[in-house]
Every structure is written in C-alpha cells, then in structure tokens.
Amino acid sequence: MSTTDRVTTPTPTVSGTDAPGPDASHCHLVVVGGGITGLAAAWQGMARGARVSVVESDDHFGGKVVTDRRDGFLVEQGPDSFVAYRPAALKLIEELGLSDQVIAPGGGRRVSLLSRGKLRPMPAGMGMVLPTRMWPFVTTTVLSWPDKIRAGLDLVIPRRLPDHDVAIGAFLRQRLGDGIVRRFADPMVGGIYGAGIDELSLDAVLPSLRDNERDHRSLMVASLAGGRASRRAARQRAAQNNAQQNSSHQNSTGQNNSAGTRGPAASPFRTLRGGLGQLIDALVDQLRAGGVELLVNTSVDLLGRDGVHLSDGRVLPADAVVLAGGVASSARLLRPQLPAAARALAQIPLASTTIVSLAWPVSAFDVAPDSQGWLEADAGPVSGLTASSIKFAGRAPDGSVLMRVFVPDKRGPLTDAPDDELLSAVIDHVRPLLGVHGEPGLTQITRWHKVMPKYTVGHLERAAVVDSTLAEQRPTWAVAGSALHGVGLPDCISDARHSADEVIDAALAATPSAPNRNAATDRTETR
C-alpha cells in the first residue's frame, strides 16, 4: 500500500529537441508502463506542464533496468550501460542532476572473441561488422587466412543489393564471405538484438551498409575511410582540448604542458556510479515530487473513448496516451480499436535471454583477470561474458571479481533449463576459459522471457503500419519503447520523449482552448 500526493515543484529544465512546446496544463497524459520508456515519457509530459499518470503492472518501476545491491556487490539484472554517442540518455541524466555520477569503463583489455576454441583479442579498430583499420584485421587470429582472402574480394565485387529489405547475414555473405559473418557480425550484432544474423533486417538494424554499398561499392573501402575520418576528428578534438588545458595551466602556473600522451580509443559506453537503477530511482523521486501520479500493481484492461480502464475498476480520463509496456501489452490494448496496428505489433518476434551473475575471489584464478569479457563466435549455449567489476568501478568488493554470463534462447534450450542445471552448465563452460577454481561465492539468475523485440526482415514495414495507423486514426495515442525504433537505452528515452510530445500536441490541437474537464479530479490515490 502506498500513497501518491501532488506537490508543487518547478518543472524540469530541458532544451534542444526536448524543449517543451505549447503549455499543456489542461492535458492529461496517461503512460502505460513504468520502465525507462514510460518514465521518460512521463518526464517529458511533466516538462510540458501536463497532468501525468503512470500505470505499472509490476510492483516496481524500471522494467528491465534492475540494479541489485547485496553483500558489497552491485549486480545489474538487465542492461549495464548505454552508448554515449546517442545523446538522449546523457541529456536526461543531466536534467536529473546526475551528470557527476556518470562513469566510463575503467582499465582492463577490451573484449575478446571465443573463436575456434580459443579466446582471441578483438582486432583494434573493429566495428560491429567491418574493420576501420586494415593491419589489425590482416593480422588477427580470429579469422583464418581463407576467410580474410574471401573478405578481401569485397574490394572488387560489384554492387548487388536489391531495393527490398534483406537479412544482414545474406548480404554480408555475398560481399564478405561466411567467415566474417560467423566470427564477427553474428556474435556482435546478434548479441545486441537477440536474434541470429540471418533473420535480422538490414534496413532496420544496419541501414548504413546499404548506403556504403551505394556510395562506395566496397564495404571495406567505406569502413576504412570512415575509420580514418573518425581518427582525424578525434585527434583534432584532442588537440583542441590540450590547447585549452595548456592555456589554462599556463595562465595559472606560467608553465606549458604541451607534451601529450596518446592513449587508447575511448570507450563509447557509460553508466552511473550506482548502477542504472540510480537513473530509475532519480526519475521516480523527481516525478513524484513534481506531482506525477505513479501507480504500481495496476494493469490496464482497456483503452476506451472515455479513458484508460484499470484493473481495479477505475477509469483514468486521458487526453493523450503513451503505450510503453512492451510489444504484447501494446498489441493487446490496441486490438479492439486498431486491429491493423495490433496485428503489425504482434508480428514482431520476441527473444528470451537469461543472465547468470557469478563472483569469485581473485585468489581463485590462475591469473588475475584483466579483460572486460568476451563474445562467443563458436557454437554453444553462451553468447558472451562481461567482467562487470573490471568494466566498471564499484561493482564488487576488493578482492572479488563479478561477472555476467549471457544465455540467449537463440543459442539453444539451456536458457529455459532449471536453475541448478543452468548454473552447472554455465560454470562448467566458463571455468576453463577463466582459469578459475572452486565454486563462485555469489550466484544470481535473472530470466527475461519474451521481452526483447527482434528486428527481423520487414521490420520497418511493420513499424510503419503501427505509426501510420495511430497517426491517422488515434493521433493522441502512441507506442513507444524498444518495439519499433531502437532497442538501446538512449533509443527508448528519445522515442518516449518524442512520443509524449506528439500525443500532447495532438490533444492540444484537437481542443486548443478547452480546459480539461477532469483537471480537478483528485490526484491522491491510495492503493
């Protein structure tokens, strides 16, 4: 049982593409789903001045973002980081006043690949599919020489891509051969999207490959050129930063520190010092302080013309609705009134995965681990391992190493095995690769069943049906989150804020001068 009370506080300060539009104080926005997408939509609605309600069926907010703290360990049960080159997550973090809590990966070697039975270093400059540096690619032991020679034929193969969408795997095999697909593209791209490379959509997942073939013909030429441009831009930024730092230092001490060091390329990944759950906690606290109605243990039965029908019998009057509860939930709620959109959503396949967290004392290892983990190109039940306490600071007590092992359903049935069988198989799999002895001091199993949308061939067409149906028939409703427009944390946040703006603007356009008749509805609910 809890009580949500409305208090008056300033709305968040936002800028750029997320800047508030026309005043929405007469608009009631209902957000279905209290994961990161739903909370970000609520944050944007609050910034617009709208009355906002968030309805979550679970007993907590955050969805797949769950941070568990116990015995000195910080265990992420869902995502553990986000990419910094997509700004939506960092922007939201700044608005929440958490910028000083952002951390980057620490020391330790970069990710390795389990290929042909051995852990091998990822070649420097390797992107998700293609190399951005030639020599590390030529000398890598991940690929055999026949695989490298076949990949090199891309330099002379003519353009072959059809106008329609195709599987990434089929396209890459045609240009680069099977080796680079199995050893690089499938573990890296498939690992992110929870699907095999031979079912993932080129146009939805890696549309830049189509552009590269059109503009350069050779994918290798395009990638190497892009790598050179990126390194040149990085050097220019570093020179500018050094000049600014030297100028500041010289002004204060009279000395010139012009000699610099050339370090490794910065990681694109970021997280929060207290885990990604810190982001959820801050959102919930500030939304509650801003008067947003936050409901847990409450599901939505129906989207009606009179409002949002809740499982407890209440009806929330709604001028605008953002559906952020996932593919299955959104399809169910749209089906009575928008069957075409519901069918398109239901056609998006969903993947399952299990995360097994393990911790050993450093003394249990033959050699103290210094790698941030590995991906697996070889066949087997595990897709990869992340050494959480090496990747990010503050994840384990001194003298311990915390790791997360990923067991997706695309790798076989082990993900659904009983806990004892799953745990035994995972430990037996990673033990010889880690050189670790004894039983782990911490074990934790987190199962995510049918929650990861797979962007298979034709995904953009399915997404277009959903978007166009809503725009034409229910412009004050939107579907947001990982189902349609991107699976990463920044993608979900950006989509949520854009969706909130769209439905609020549509509601204001429908009744531009009419105050919300339900504005006086009691904002305090006890459950």
UniProtKB/Swiss-Prot annotation:
Disulfide pattern: none
Pathway assigned in UniProt: Porphyrin-containing compound metabolism; protoheme biosynthesis
InterPro entries associated with the record: Amino_oxidase (IPR002937), FAD/NAD-bd_sf (IPR036188), Protoporphyrinogen_oxidase (IPR004572), Zeta_carotene_desat/Oxidored (IPR050464)
Species the sequence originates in: Propionibacterium freudenreichii subsp. freudenreichii
Annotated region (Disordered), positions in chain: 1-23, 231-267
Major subcellular location class: cytoplasm
Record function comment: Involved in coproporphyrin-dependent heme b biosynthesis. Catalyzes the oxidation of coproporphyrinogen III to coproporphyrin III.
Co-factor remark: Binds 1 FAD per subunit.
GO annotation, cellular component aspect: cytoplasm
Binding residues annotated for FAD, in chain numbering: 33-38, 56-57, 64, 78-81, 300, 448, 487-489
Reaction equations catalysed: coproporphyrinogen III + 3 O2 = coproporphyrin III + 3 H2O2
Compartments, record wording: Cytoplasm
Keywords associated with the record: Cytoplasm, FAD, Flavoprotein, Heme biosynthesis, Oxidoreductase
Family: Belongs to the protoporphyrinogen/coproporphyrinogen oxidase family. Coproporphyrinogen III oxidase subfamily.
Its EC number(s): 1.3.3.15
Transmembrane stretches, start-end: none
Known cofactor(s): FAD
PANTHER family for this protein: PROTOPORPHYRINOGEN OXIDASE (PTHR42923:SF3)
SUPFAM superfamilies membership: FAD-linked reductases, C-terminal domain (SSF54373), FAD/NAD(P)-binding domain (SSF51905)
GO BP field: heme biosynthetic process
Gene Ontology molecular function, alphabetical: oxygen-dependent protoporphyrinogen oxidase activity
Full protein name: Coproporphyrinogen III oxidase
Record field: compositional bias (Low complexity): 1-14, 236-252
